[in-house]
Amino acid sequence: MPEDVQEEVYRSIQGLENCEIMRPAYAIEYDCIDPTQLNLQLEAKHIQGLYFAGQINGSSGYEEAAAQGLVAGVNSAGGTMNIDRAEGYIGVLIDDLVTKGTNEPYRMMTSRAEYRLLLRQDNADLRLTEKGYKAGLIKPDRYRLFTRKQEVIEAEIRRLAKITLSPDIANKMLAEKFSALLSSGSKITDLIKRPELNYWDVIALAPKQSEEPPSADYVQGVGVQAGAHDEPPLPEYIRDAIEEQVNIQIKYEGYISMQLTQAASFRKMEHKALPAHIDYDEIKGLRIEARQKLSKLRPANLGQASRITGVSPADLSILLVYLKAR
C-alpha cells in the first residue's frame, strides 16, 4: 500500500494516533511462467534447449531457486541430472512444480515429501554424491573419500551383524543403561535397536568376542588405519559420520526397509514412460477430466500422471493397459 495509506491505517488504531513510521512496509511482486510447461529437467516442453530456474517457475527464492538453478544448469550445459522424489527434496520441489503447478510462491517443506525417512540430512552425500560425480560436479578425490566411507559403513554393519554377545559380557553395561538383561546370547545389532541403547554403548564390547576383523579403514568405531592401496587415514569428520550412519542404519533398519520398498514401487511407476505425443482423446475409458488434465500437462511417465489432481486409479489402470498394448 502507498505510504500515506499505511500511515492512515496505523493512526486509526487506539494509542497509535500520533505514531511515525520509520520504514514503510513493502511487498515483492514478480512475474512467473506456468511451470507445468516444463519437463523434469526444467526444459521448456515446446522449445528445446530453453531452461527455466528460480522464482520465474513459481517458487520462492533462496534455497528453492538455487536448487532449480543447479539442475537446470547441469542439464543446459549438456549433462544429465534428474533427481526423483525418493532421492532428494530437489526432486520433490521440481516434481511438484512441473506436475501440479502453483498458485502462490512454492516453499519446500518436509511435509511435502512422501519418503522423509530416506531424505535425511545425515545421508545427503550417500544419496546424491554418485549423481553429482556423474554430472561432473564432484572431483575425483572427494568421490574416492565418498566411496571409502560407503564401503566402510557397509563393512561395519556386516561385521556387527555377525557378533553375538553373551550375558556375562553384556549384562553389566545393560544394567548401567537400565536395559533388560540377557538370559542368552544376543546379536549386537539387536541390542543397538533397543531404544535406550546405541552404537557407542555396545561397540566397546564387540572386539572381546568378535572373530570378524574390522574393515581395513575402520577399527572398532574409534580408530582408523591406512586402507587398501596405501591410502591415507580417513579424516576424523568422516569417521564420526560413519559411526552416526552405522547407528542410524541399524537402529531404524525396519522403518528404512519399509520406505525403501515403497520407493521401489514408486520407481516402477516412474519407469513406465508415457510417449510425448499420446492422443489421450483416443484412449477409451478415460474420464473427461483425466483426458483434459493429461492432454494439458503431458506427464513424462505413469508415476507423474498419478500425482495429477483429477487422474484416478481407474484412469491409471487404463493407461497401463494402453501402454502394454502398444
Regions picked out by a protein language model, each given a short descriptive name:
Residues A65-I83:
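Internal hydrophobic alpha-helix adjacent to the cofactor/substrate pocket in enzyme cavities
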Residues N18-M22, G79-D84, K139-Y143:
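Acidic/polar loop patches that form or flank catalytic/metal-binding clefts of enzymes
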Residues P2-N57, R85-D95, D240-K293, R298:
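A glycine-rich dinucleotide-binding beta-alpha-beta segment and adjacent secondary-structure elements
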Residues Q55-Y62, E114-R116:
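Glycine-rich phosphate/pyrophosphate-binding beta-alpha loops
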Residues A72-S76, L128, L319:
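Buried hydrophobic packing segments
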Residues R112, T129-K134, I138-E211, S215-Y218, ...:
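Extended, charge-enriched "interface" segments that sit outside catalytic cores
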Residues I94, T102, Y106-K134, K139-Y143:
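Mobile "lid/hinge" segments at catalytic clefts and subdomain interfaces of large enzymes
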